[in-house]
Amino acid sequence: GSASISPGVLNGVFDSTATSGLHVIASTVAQSEVVMVPIGIRAAPAAGDPVFMGEFVQLGYHAVEEGGAIFANIPFGEWDVSDLLSHSRSKPWGVLIHAKAARTAANTAVGIDDYGAATALGGYMMYQIFAGDGTATITIEDASTNTNPNFAALTGATTGELDCSSVQKGVVDLTATRAVKRYLRWQLSLNTATTVTFALAFCRTITVGF
């Protein structure tokens, strides 16, 4: 036999919000989905917490009533084979760079230390945009010293300009030889948007194959 990777069954409260509700974004089955499952450490997920992340095939979508509330059960299969074959993503565990929240300006805060050292083997970025009112670009910045002036764009770690008024999701691969400095943080460049609600994660490649 061989090992398999899957988030299993995700459960949520049924939400029929027109553009960003659970029903809208998860009711289509038998397709590959970008999945991020942040794990809060004794609290709601926050920057620096682990994230189970990857592209997985959605197997179903089931709405059930319990105690007067409606819940959705969403089973996922293994990591999408076509995704694994076309990208060099070797593990599903990353770190949360930005927990789901609305932002209205660029980031000048310090970042997180996700590994304790710089690396030189790239990685991949995963993002979810839940709401917004125009176009914007989300990026990851890195730094060797955890101070605002030291941060600069991590080459390749960008969504490109997106229309954030609709739900957006995706994965961005860095080159396999991309140097990644020790500290990481999110960055937001607003174009026509004045607010964007998003989540952002990064998986750093530590050694070849892991």
Give the role of each language-model region.
Residues 37-86, 178-179:
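Short beta-strand and beta-hairpin "edge-sheet" elements
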Residues 167-181:
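Short, surface-exposed tryptophan/glycine-enriched loops
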Residues 189-210:
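C-terminal interaction-tip segments
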Residues 80-109:
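Surface-exposed beta-loop interaction hotspot
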Residues 119-131, 184-188:
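A short beta-strand element within beta-rich, extracytoplasmic domains
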